[in-house]
């Protein structure tokens, strides 16, 4: 017996429903994530958050190996037999168990790296999460392969709520950073229970004779790319933790969660829509690049507008969401929002890499961009936590032109100047909006923090409204409206 991906009959309808479920689930996860940042910041100190960030910035690398790319391998396989699925389950479970042991044994070394004894015991308890996640991997992949996006969305939302609930209860007992480990384990355990119950299958004993070499090779290629990305995403935390201690790292980590992680989650559903559409348009030349251009502009008038507001209103936003003891995180939040602007606008390049299937050049570009990021962070760290944030803001501003140049070397007909001007234009508009937000926040300061945030948000929208006087901005908005109409029409046609 074998498991095949859903056939073409009704696939469009299921894809549309799945996209809606995924988007709804993503929206709820973002809300829960923000609520978690706000609530736990009120219950725990910057040092507590810094200690947990020390654990995860190093131990978290095990999560890359835990999956080993085998979940994606199982999802994309044309045919997956029941025995292959069971064998993959046991492989992922064994990897999870091995990594849990490895992280446990590494705990004293991680603590020594940071000079914080408590990190060792925190790491030892957190290691259990890698075992739980390893066991859950193929159950989750099975739901994904079967296009059961509602089940996945429910799992993610419920697990996040369970984790937050456990974390809050433990935090109220006054145990500090242990509450964050409890939140991690609560979410991991809830995920395992839910995906195992919803997947509707149980693994059989492992047996040889079923070919899985192709899955391993696919997985290794995924791991290589994810490793590079992981290093780039965590070098800042390691540098701050080692050089400046848990208090500074805790401040930085909360700002990172608010700016970078939220922007990443906002981009994810857009990427999930853009990549398959661009894959269908590969042979249509001009239409393909028109969609890339308009998609880039669309990001500039949605996610980047929010980031522009955060850049200008970082001080009142930090005070409102995190509280007064986190005031030192405000300039970091502003700088990380700048980094998120350039990362968001460069997302269109990532769509091209994936939709065109040029993952080799993508891996090599990632090596270059991560090297730039590491260099900027190390140089910036000479001026403390704020210097690291400056380095992280500069790095994507230096990397995006390289990405466009890289693509133009691999693919012919790339409208490099048009795409580059789009990024520059959207970045300038973000600066314009941020300036309005900052000025409005200053003027509203006597009225309190909430009034500052509201005034800054309104001022950001006013700034973009004024910018609409420019013909190029009006053309941008017209293009975005046209694409949205086409997508709605396409969705309606596929749902019939």
How does the language model describe each region?
Residues 1-34, 67, 72-75, 79-90, ...:
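N-terminal membrane topogenesis motif
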Residues 2-5, 9, 405, 419, ...:
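Membrane-proximal transmembrane or re-entrant/amphipathic helices at the cytosolic face
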Residues 3, 11-68, 95-109, 124-129, ...:
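Signature of the first transmembrane helix
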Residues 18-33, 180-183, 187, 191, ...:
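Transmembrane helical elements of multi-pass membrane transporters/channels
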Residues 120-127, 155-201, 217-218, 254-256, ...:
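Hydrophobic alpha-helical transmembrane segments
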């Amino acid at each position: 017996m074998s498991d095949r991906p859903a056939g073409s009959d009704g696939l469009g309808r299921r894809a549309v429903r799945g996209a809606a479920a995924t988007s709804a689930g993503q929206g709820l996860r973002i809300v829960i994530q923000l609520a978690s940042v706000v609530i736990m910041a009120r219950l725990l100190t910057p040092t507590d958050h810094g200690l947990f960030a020390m654990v995860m910035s190093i131990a978290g690398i095990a999560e890359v190996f835990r999956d080993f790319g085998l979940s994606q391998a199982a999802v994309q396989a044309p045919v997956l037999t029941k025995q292959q699925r069971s064998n993959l389950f046991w492989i992922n479970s064994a990897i999870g168990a091995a990594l849990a042991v490895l992280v446990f044994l590494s705990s004293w070394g991680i603590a020594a790296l940071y000079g914080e004894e408590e990190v060792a015991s925190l790491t030892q308890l957190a290691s259990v999460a890698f075992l739980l996640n390893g066991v859950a991997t193929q159950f989750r992949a099975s739901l994904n392969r079967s296009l059961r996006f509602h089940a996945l969305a429910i799992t993610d939302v419920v697990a996040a709520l369970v984790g937050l609930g456990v974390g809050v209860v433990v935090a109220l007992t006054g145990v500090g950073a242990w509450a964050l480990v409890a939140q991690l384990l609560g979410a991991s355990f809830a995920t395992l229970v839910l995906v195992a119950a919803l997947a509707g299958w149980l693994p059989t004993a492992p047996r040889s004779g079923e070919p899985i070499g192709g899955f391993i090779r696919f997985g290794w290629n995924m791991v290589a790319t994810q490793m590079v990305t992981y290093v780039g995403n965590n070098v800042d935390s390691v540098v701050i933790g080692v050089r400046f201690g848990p208090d500074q790292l805790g401040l930085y980590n909360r700002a990172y969660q608010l700016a970078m992680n939220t922007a990443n989650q906002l981009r994810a559903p857009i990427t999930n829509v853009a990549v398959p559409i661009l894959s269908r348009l590969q042979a249509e030349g001009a239409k393909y690049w028109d969609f890339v251009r308009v998609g880039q502009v669309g990001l500039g008038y949605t996610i980047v507008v929010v980031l522009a507001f955060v850049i200008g209103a970082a001080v009142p936003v930090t005070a409102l969401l995190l509280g007064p003891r986190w005031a030192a995180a405000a300039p970091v939040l502003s700088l990380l929002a700048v980094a998120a602007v350039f990362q968001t606008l460069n997302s269109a390049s990532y769509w091209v890499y994936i939709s065109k299937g040029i993952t080799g050049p993508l891996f090599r570009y990632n090596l270059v961009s991560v090297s730039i990021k590491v260099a900027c962070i190390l140089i910036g760290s000479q001026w403390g936590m704020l210097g690291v944030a400056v380095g992280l803001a500069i790095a994507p501003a230096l990397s995006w032109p390289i990405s466009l140049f890289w693509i133009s070397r691999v693919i012919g007909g790339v409208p490099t100047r048009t795409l580059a001007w789009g990024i520059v234009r959207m970045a300038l508009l973000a600066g314009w909006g941020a300036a309005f937000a900052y000025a409005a926040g200053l003027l509203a300061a006597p009225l309190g923090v909430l009034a500052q945030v509201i005034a800054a948000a309104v001022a950001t929208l006013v700034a973009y409204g004024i910018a609409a006087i420019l013909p190029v901005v009006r053309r941008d908005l017209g293009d975005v409206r046209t694409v949205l109409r086409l997508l709605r029409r396409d969705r309606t046609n596929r749902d019939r």
